[in-house]
Amino acid sequence: MDLFKRKVKEWVYSLSTDDHYAEYNPDETPTFNMGKRLNSNNGQVNPSQMHLNSVDEEMSMGFQNGVPSNEDINIDEFTSTESNDGVSETLLAWRHIDFWTSEHNPDLNATLSDPCTQNDITHAEEDLEVSFPNPVKASFKIHDGQEDLESMTGTSGLFYGFQLMTLDQVVAMTQAWRNVAKNLNKRSQQGLSHVTSTGSSSSMERLNGNKFKLPNIPDQKSIPPNAVQPVYAHPAWIPLITDNAGNHIGVDLAPGPNGKYAQIITFGRDFDTKFVIAENWGEFLLSFANDLEAGNWYLVDDNDDYFSGDGELVFRDKKSNGPIQDYFEVLKRRTWIKYQENLRSQQQKSQPDTSLQEQKYVPASQKKVAAEQPSTLNAESIKGEDSGSADVQSVQDHESVKIVKTEPSEAETTTVNTESLGQAEHEIKADNVDIKQESERKEDEKQPKVEEKEHVENEHVTESAKKDDDVNKQTEEMNKKEENEIRSDDAKVEEAREEFENIAL
């Protein structure tokens, strides 16, 4: 009799409740979300709820009647201990998605299920022993996935052919992937224990060869690196979208070292490299809605049958007007481009300033010594300018290089004290004395050379003078000789003239 009564109550419960996942529980008091919120506040609506409702009214402008509404969903429904990042994006995205599907593909819009109740979500969380992120809860309270895809011809998954999973399917698929992860972990532990006992890895290779009927499982990676745990399956990966071929888009509740809690990832049979495609569920939904609004879509209708539906929604980039693309490939390419841009920006920020690197730290005391040193050297060089200035300058250059080489390192300069300063000044004075002595020595060496040069020049002048005197004497003698000859000739002429006159008389 009790069993019959229970069955009757379950039947009545199924007719009177909106629960999709939650089963009838005679010990549970029925609760309603709005009534619970109003009772908790003595029948008064929370101010934040009023603000969100006013925002919803602004966002609903331009929407036609009959489009599913989520005005009764607000952030206050979610626990304050969890992050509400992505909740507002989820609400906004679903408004655009509902409006677009009702306008361009009513058959696709008809596949969207009614909302889940809080009881559904609570029971699912209890069965999976997890707490769904708030954007996921908000999404389930708008649409519980897609249904009746097989019965409705000409329709496909909402996300360019990929199906939005119902809460029942999410729980069932999560359990299936948990079994996969459990078996992988079990076989791995068995292989490690066997290798430890036998000291050989041949058994481990045989075990790996039988996993999932594959020769081996490749190394698991992620983009960005270390954002997702490097495993094939994980119990904390909750699938939300499926391609019905073993691949999923889901929420990651156990991210890697460089990941973020509740990030959205791709995983499954074809994803040895996992891709982080969004930081949260709301961000992913909003990016999909933006693609629809931007015109990155195409409806494939293979026949002219009126009853075949509006066609299958596929991705095609509007700007390039290129071919139809697989949505997984689009998400992977976008993630890779975003990762490369972030990598370049990080490299630019981490590049050191070369001008700062070339500057070497010099303490104040060392700078003072360096400032005083050139004046001392210049004074010495001026003093010996007329005697070996080039040699003195080379010595100064040598000493300046010596001073630079003996500069303390950054670690040593922190311990410079007055004693080291006095020692440095003493060494500099000693170097100045050496420079002065070197200059005097070179001046002394140069002085004999100057005297010798003057002596040689004097001898050369004396010899030249002697030669000039000899030439002058010779010239005078020749002149005198010529004068004597001329006088002798004149006398002979005079004598001949007188003889001629005597003869004439």
Swiss-Prot record:
Polar residues compositional bias, start-end: 343-358, 411-421
Main location group: nucleus
Modified residues (Phosphoserine): 202-203, 381, 394, 400
Key word Translocase present: no
Record GO cellular component, one term: nucleus
SMART domains, sorted: SMI1_KNR4
Subcellular location: Nucleus
Entry superkingdom: Eukaryota
Biased composition (Basic and acidic residues): 396-408, 424-495
Segments for region (Disordered): 343-505
GO molecular function annotation: DNA binding
GO BP, sorted A to Z: cell wall organization; fungal-type cell wall beta-glucan biosynthetic process; regulation of fungal-type cell wall biogenesis; regulation of mitotic cell cycle
Phosphothreonine PTM sites in chain numbering: 376
Glycyl lysine isopeptide (Lys-Gly) (interchain with G-Cter in ubiquitin), cross-linked positions: 453
Keyword Metal-binding (UniProt): no
General function of this protein: Protein involved in the regulation of cell wall assembly and 1,3-beta-glucan synthesis, possibly through the transcriptional regulation of cell wall glucan and chitin synthesis.
Family affiliation: Belongs to the KNR4/SMI1 family.
PANTHER family to which the protein is assigned, alphabetical: CELL WALL ASSEMBLY REGULATOR SMI1
Miscellaneous information on this protein: Present with 5680 molecules/cell in log phase SD medium.
Subunit-level organization: Interacts with TYS1.
The name this protein goes by in its record: Cell wall assembly regulator SMI1
Gene name of the encoded protein: SMI1
